[in-house]
């Protein structure tokens, strides 16, 4: 896990984004998914230029307000701070509905339920300290192995969602050394 911390800490843009998100003081907020995954994949492929962000996934957890409009308001606040970043904000207290799960207990639980393991990662700055959450194999992540999380594996009844996502994303074109595991 130290290697992941070191990658994030050494990237001033990533730290800046994490600090901007922290400044909003959203409950249980993190930056997740491709923001971190792509940095790791770029590094293991030896890329010196960063893959541009499709979006920066900001997540938070507020079970008392499931109205999607609040997410748009937070996106606007982030754009007001820095409009050059493609912000995407989602309340994880309502995202369980997307894949017919029980309501998540917090943001980390939601991240653990992401489709594939390398995407099920999040980071934040909290009280000036970097925190990273990743519940899957760090060795697999650092070796470019893409596999479904337990919630989308062959026995889950949702494996087709994983396969559809892998086919749609076409990650092997950007990162040809990835290994896809079932």
Model-derived features: positions:
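Catalytic cores of the polymerase beta-like nucleotidyltransferase superfamily
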Residues: 1-182
